[in-house]
C-alpha cells in the first residue's frame, strides 16, 4: 500500500480557504474556485482529496454540498469530507452524493453508536474517525474541551467498533508550519489495526518522510501546499 499524500481543501462560503489553527477570520489563502483547486491537485497526482466544510463545522450549514458533488462527479479520486457531521442523516446525505468517506469528530466521541450504525449500513471504509490530540489527550468541540481520554485509548476503541480509518491531528502544531512530531503518530499506529492518516504541522518534504516512517497510511497537507513550500508532485515523488 503506497503512502498517500492528501491535499486539503477547506470550504467556506463556496471558496477554498486556509485558516490558522481553525480560527474563523484568519484566512491565509482564499481562492474563489474550489473545483479548480481540486483539478490542480488531481493534475499533480492526488489520489485522495480531504475536504473540510468549515460552514458545516461552524454553523451546521450544508451550503457547500454542491461543490463537493461537482468535485466527486468530475474527478476519479477518493473524496473524504469532514466538518460538522453530527448525525446519521448528514452522513447518509453526504455519502449519497458519492463521497467515499465521512469524517466524524466530536459526534463519534459523544455518540459512538453513530460509528457502529454507519459502519454496519455503509461499510467501515466509509467511516473515518477524527482524533484531535492536544498534549496526548483527545479534544472535542473545536479543540475547546478535553475528552479525558488518551489518543491511543480512543484509537483502539474506535478501531474495535467499526471505524475504517483514523485521522490524527496534532493540535499543538496544526496550521503553524513548525514541523511534525512523529512519536505520537507512531504510538497511535502501533495501538490500532486500521489505517492512520496524520495531519498537522507539515512544513517541508522531510516531514512527510518522518510521517511515512511511523507506519501511517498517509498525511493530509494544507498550509504548506497553499504557501508553495513544496508542490504536491514533489511530495508524492519523494515518498512513493
Curated annotation (Swiss-Prot):
Q: Which keywords, in A-to-Z order, does the entry hold? A: Amino-acid biosynthesis, Cytoplasm, Histidine biosynthesis, Isomerase
Subcellular location(s) per record: Cytoplasm
Q: Which GO terms describe its molecular function?
A: 1-(5-phosphoribosyl)-5-[(5-phosphoribosylamino)methylideneamino]imidazole-4-carboxamide isomerase activity
One GO cellular component this record assigns the protein to is: cytoplasm
Principal location class = cytoplasm
Which pathway does it serve? Amino-acid biosynthesis; L-histidine biosynthesis; L-histidine from 5-phospho-alpha-D-ribose 1-diphosphate: step 4/9
Q: Does the keyword Amino-acid biosynthesis apply?
A: yes
Q: A GO BP term, please?
A: L-histidine biosynthetic process
Answer whether the UniProt record assigns the keyword Hydrolase to this protein: no
Do you know which InterPro entries this protein is assigned to?
Answer: Aldolase_TIM (IPR013785), His_biosynth (IPR006062), HisA_bact_arch (IPR006063), Isoase_HisA-like (IPR044524), Isoase_HisA-like_bact (IPR023016), RibuloseP-bd_barrel (IPR011060)
Q: Which reaction does it catalyse?
A: 1-(5-phospho-beta-D-ribosyl)-5-[(5-phospho-beta-D-ribosylamino)methylideneamino]imidazole-4-carboxamide = 5-[(5-phospho-1-deoxy-D-ribulos-1-ylimino)methylamino]-1-(5-phospho-beta-D-ribosyl)imidazole-4-carboxamide
Q: Which residues form a coiled coil?
A: none
Q: What is its EC number?
A: 5.3.1.16
UniProt-listed CDD domains:
HisA
> Where, by residue number, is the active site?
10, 132
Q: Which HAMAP family match?
A: HisA
NCBIfam families, per this entry?
Answer: 1-(5-phosphoribosyl)-5-[(5-phosphoribosylamino)methylideneamino]imidazole-4-carboxamide isomerase, PRK13585.1
Family the UniProt entry places it in: Belongs to the HisA/HisF family.
| UniProt-recorded name of the protein | 1-(5-phosphoribosyl)-5-[(5-phosphoribosylamino)methylideneamino] imidazole-4-carboxamide isomerase
Q: Which organism is the protein's source? A: Methanocella arvoryzae (strain DSM 22066 / NBRC 105507 / MRE50)
Question: What gene is it encoded by?
Answer: hisA
Amino acid at each position: 500500500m503506497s503512502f498517500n499524500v492528501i491535499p486539503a481543501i477547506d470550504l467556506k462560503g463556496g471558496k477554498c480557504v486556509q485558516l490558522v489553527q481553525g480560527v474563523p477570520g484568519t484566512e491565509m489563502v482564499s481562492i474563489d474556485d474550489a473545483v479548480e483547486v481540486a483539478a490542480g491537485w488531481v493534475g499533480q497526482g492526488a489520489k485522495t482529496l480531504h475536504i473540510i466544510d468549515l460552514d458545516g463545522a461552524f454553523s451546521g450549514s450544508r451550503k457547500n454540498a454542491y461543490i463537493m458533488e461537482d468535485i466527486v462527479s468530475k474527478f476519479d479520486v477518493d473524496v473524504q469530507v469532514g466538518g460538522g457531521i453530527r448525525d446519521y442523516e448528514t452522513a447518509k446525505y453526504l455519502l449519497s452524493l458519492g463521497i467515499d468517506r465521512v469524517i466524524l469528530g466530536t459526534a463519534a466521541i459523544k455518540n459512538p453508536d453513530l460509528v457502529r450504525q454507519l459502519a454496519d449500513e455503509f461499510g467501515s471504509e466509509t467511516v473515518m474517525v477524527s482524533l484531535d490530540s492536544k498534549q496526548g489527550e483527545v479534544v472535542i468541540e473545536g479543540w475547546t474541551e478535553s475528552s479525558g481520554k488518551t489518543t491511543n485509548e480512543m484509537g483502539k476503541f474506535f478501531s474495535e467498533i467499526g471505524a475504517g480509518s483514523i485521522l490524527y491531528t496534532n493540535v499543538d502544531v496544526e496550521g503553524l508550519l513548525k514541523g511534525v512530531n512523529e512519536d505520537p503518530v507512531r504510538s497511535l499506529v502501533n495501538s490500532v489495526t486500521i489505517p492512520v492518516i496524520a495531519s498537522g504541522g507539515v512544513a517541508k518534504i522531510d516531514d512527510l518522510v518522518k510521517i511515512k516512517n511511523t507506519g501511517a497510511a498517509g498525511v493530509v497537507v494544507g498550509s504548506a501546499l497553499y504557501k508553495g513550500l513544496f508542490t504536491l508532485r514533489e511530495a508524492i515523488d519523494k515518498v512513493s
